[in-house]
C-alpha cells in the first residue's frame, strides 16, 4: 500500500511547471496517513504491545458505548452516545453533541479533564496531540496541560502532524516532512518530500534534494532510525511499487515483472536483496519472527525469510495473532476461521465467522449470531458479564491540522514579487498557465479544472479553485483575447495574460480573519511597489511594469497583479464590511456582477 506514496511522488517529480518551491505539497497525505495507521495496526511486525488499556464497545446495535478490556472486565457500560477512543494512559476522548472532543479520566466517574478540542488523538505516548478551535496543534499531558505547541521550524509554520509511531510524530512544514519526539524536539528535520514510519524503529523518506528529478534511477530512498540518523540510502529504481514496513531489519518490497505484474521480495535497510522477488509471491500480508504471510495471487501461505515455504498457499486468508499463532480462513462452501499453530496444529476445534486479532494473547472473534466474544491463545472463551455487539480500536484523529494561520508565513508562500506572484507572471503563455494551474489542481484542487483546449472556446480567462493548507482561494489569469484557437487546430493561443488574480474566501482558516489578511497583504505590497492610492481596506501600488491591487469587501479579499486602469477603480467601494449577499467560491455569477459594480473594469479577475 505504501508504494502508492512513492508512485505519487514520482508523478509529482516528473511534472515540471512554474510553481513556487514552498507551495508544492502532497495532498494525499491524509489518505496515506490512514493507510499507514491501518497497516501499523492490522499487519505490523507484531512486536509491539497494544497501548489500549480498555476498548470501546456497545451491547446493542443502537446502544451507547462503554469500555471493556481483554480480560472481560467492564469499566463503563452504556455511557456515551458517540464512539469514544480507546483508553490509554488512563485517559480517553469522546465527542460531545457539538462535535468537540472531550478528555475523560478512565474510571467509574469518567471526569472531564482539559478543554474542548476540534481534534484529538489517543495517548500513544505520555502526551497526546489536540487542536483547539482557532489555535495551533498542542500536545497535552493526561491532566490537560499543554506540554508543547507546534509553531514553526526556522520561521516556517508547521501546518499538520500525525500521532506517534515508534516514538516519533511526523509533521509537515512548508511542504516538507520531518518528525518530532514526545518532548517536541525536532528529531528529523523537515527536509523530506515524503516521510513514513516503516515500523521496527525505522522511517523511510525521499529527501527534497530529489525534487524535480525526472530520472527515477537517480532518486534514492532514505532509511532513518528514531534518532534521525540516516542509516542508508538505496535506489528507488530498485523497486517498482509496494514499499511496506520493516520487520527484523527486513523490508518487504515489490518489483514489476516482465508481464507487468508486481512480485514481492525482501531487502535489508541497505537495499540488498535478502529474498529476491519470486513469481510465487504476489503480495506480502504480514511479517513476524523471520516469517511472512504471502499470497500467490489466489491463496495464502506462510514462508520464512530464506524462501522456504512453511505452509503452502491453501487458505483464503491468514492473519498473525499476537501469540505466535495464526488465524486461517478455510476455502470451503461456508468459509470459517480457525486458530492454528505455525505447524498447522489446530488449537481449538471451534471455528469463527469473523476474527480480529490484537497485540497480545487474546482476540475478538465472532461465532454464530451478532455478538463478539473474547478468546485466549488456547481458544477458550474469556467470560464477560456483557454482550459485545460492536467494539472499536478508535484512536481518535490520525491527521491533525493547525487552525492557526501564521499570516507572515502564508504570505511569504504566495511569493509576491515585483513582476508577479505564485510563480506566475505576465509574460507566460497560455500553455504555461495551463500547466501551472493543472499541477496546482492536482495538489489542492477543489473543483473541476480542465487542461483541454476545447474547454476554453470563446473564453478569455483561466481559473482554478484551491484549498491550500486549509485556506480556500481561487487563482485566475485573464487575457485580452480567446485563450484557445476557435478551430482547435493549434490548441491554445500564443498569448500572455494581462492580469493575474487571487480571491480569498471567508472560509476555513480565513473565516473571520479577512481584515488581518488585508492588512498583511497591504504591508507586503508596500515593500514591492510604490503606493498609488490607499484606503483602510484597499491599496494600489505600482510594481514592475504593472500594478498590484488588494481590497476587501468583508466577504472576500481580492489580490490582483496586471494592467488595469487604476483611475477607474473606486477604492471606497471596498469597505471591509459584508453588505452584499454572501457568496462562496461556488457562486461565480454573483462574484462577476459584484466586480463589475466596483469598476475594476472588464479586465479585472476576481
Feature roles, as predicted:
Residues 21-22, 26-29:
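Positively charged n-region of N-terminal signal peptides that target proteins for export
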Residues 29-39:
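Sec-dependent N-terminal signal peptides
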Residues 46-404:
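Residue-level detector of conserved, function-critical positions
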